[in-house]
Amino acid sequence: MSIDWKCLWHDPFFHIGLLAKIVLILLIVPTVQEQWFVPFVVSVIEQPTLSPWTQFLQQGGDPLAFPYGLMMLLVQLPAVLIGYLADGIFGISYFSGVGFRVSLLLADLLVLLLLVKMFSKYVRKLIVYYWLSPILIYITYWHGQTDIIPVSFLVLGLFLL
């Protein structure tokens, strides 16, 4: 899958959206991620098991913590692991959450790239209406929901048809 990055990289609206999303990733800590999602993924990193949901509940974890399946967990694990290692180096618990949010940004970027590949005539419209969508930005980067990950799988499936 070859994607011409130039069409995105040279668009100032792409840069505006990317900068805004990075700033939100660094400055906003959504409550659902802080209280539920990130602690669950960190518990999987600290105590790997074949049944992470059962183990998390047995250790007194919140049943609402991570109501997603294995694919969602596998998507989140690499970036959270990198953040977790950085947390250990610096002695804080900040970068695990940043890693979680970076994985959402990567899924968001994947959706944009696939849409650009499928609809190359409409690059500017895709950037303006998808990449800069206030709904997407609010749901993903402000509220902290992970819906962009299954959306990226859906768009990837459509792309591969």
Label each region the model flagged:
Residues 1-28, 120-123:
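Start-transfer (signal-anchor) and selected internal transmembrane alpha helices
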Residues 22-42:
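Helix-to-loop transition at the C-terminal end of transmembrane segments
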Residues 95-123:
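Transmembrane-helix motifs of polytopic, lipid-linked glycan transferases
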Residues 36-67, 71, 81-88:
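Extracytosolic helix-loop segments that constitute the early lumenal/periplasmic catalytic or substrate-binding loops
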Residues 105, 124-137:
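Transmembrane and membrane-interface helices of multi-pass
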Residues 141-149:
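Short acidic/glycine- and proline-prone juxtamembrane loop motifs at membrane-interface regions
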Residues 11-15, 74, 102, 127-129:
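Hydrophobic alpha-helical transmembrane segments
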Residues 113-117, 149-161:
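Specific aromatic-rich, kink-prone transmembrane helix
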